Amino acid sequence: MSGIISVMTQSLILSIMALGVYITYKILDFPDMSADGSYTMGASIVAFSLTNGISPVVATLMAILCGCTAGLVTGILHIKFKISNLLSGILVMGMLYSINLRIMGKSNIPLFSFKHLFNGEISPIVLALAFVFICKILLDLFLKTGLGYTLKGVGDNSQMIKSLGINIGSIKILGLMISNGLIALSGSLMAQFLGFSDVNMGIGTLVLGIASIIIGITLFKKFTFIKDTTAIIVGSFIYQFTIYFAMSLGMLSTDLKLITAIVIIAFLATGNLNISLKKTNAKLVPKINQKKEVL
């Protein structure tokens, strides 16, 4: 039972990261490879702060701020220096690896003996749920504002937004900052929940986030009343429990990437198959009606 609760808590924390990836991957259509580094940066900042006697709350806020800064750098490289979006993310990811290692001073820092958010009186799963709820509500509210609609517009049709006299570069940078801030928040919470920070803990973060997005949106795309943010949170749960049950059946931790790839392929293939069937049916219906009229 404790194992399931632990997986649920981790799913909640990782869903915050998935919400951050959603902004760049789904809204901005920006392949931000720096997500792995931003996630680890959140953990690194918290580890450094806690070991130096800084409050867990302040440490978590610092992690968010540093994540936003990472997004800002990615945006500047792409917008101001005209470096491609993919390469900008890769460059920042590489820089963050060295920066995170420099921040921590070593590759791994245990946090069990330090006071942090998850070893207080509040239950870890309740605290994680509170963070997810706040992030989801704030993101939903933001996306309903004029700035939020502009952010969506930049991803859908940047030329139209540009024709309105809006600086699309600034909007992209803002989106990257929010995205990486959420990802760093997730990393900081995960480090506190697990009780350690590791320089390699962010590897695969982007893939995990994309998997949660694909699973959630594929499952709930027919239900228009369900928001994407809700679908992504559920997708994160489904993905994490898929991994959990696969590990319970005896699969090795080295098989995680294989499992992830299979899960993503399965949901993508299912979604594409449904689209193909709809198109085929749409073509067949008029022909059937014509035959009936002839008869």
Curated annotation (Swiss-Prot):
Protein location: Cell membrane
Stored InterPro entries: ABC_transp_permease (IPR001851)
One biological process term in Gene Ontology: amino acid transport
Membrane topology term: Multi-pass membrane protein
Segments crossing the lipid bilayer: 3-23, 57-77, 81-101, 122-142, 173-193, 200-220, 232-252, 256-276
Broad class of where this protein is predominantly found: membrane
Keywords for this protein: Amino-acid transport, Cell membrane, Membrane, Transmembrane, Transmembrane helix, Transport
GO MF terms, alphabetically ordered: transmembrane transporter activity
GO cellular component: plasma membrane
Function in brief: Probably part of an ABC transporter complex involved in tyrosine uptake. May also import phenylalanine. Probably responsible for the translocation of the substrate across the membrane.
Assembly, per entry: The complex is probably composed of two ATP-binding proteins (CDR20291_0806), two transmembrane proteins (CDR20291_0807) and a solute-binding protein (CDR20291_0805).
Entry's family note: Belongs to the binding-protein-dependent transport system permease family.
Name of the protein in its database record: Tyrosine transport system permease protein
Species of origin: Clostridioides difficile (strain R20291)
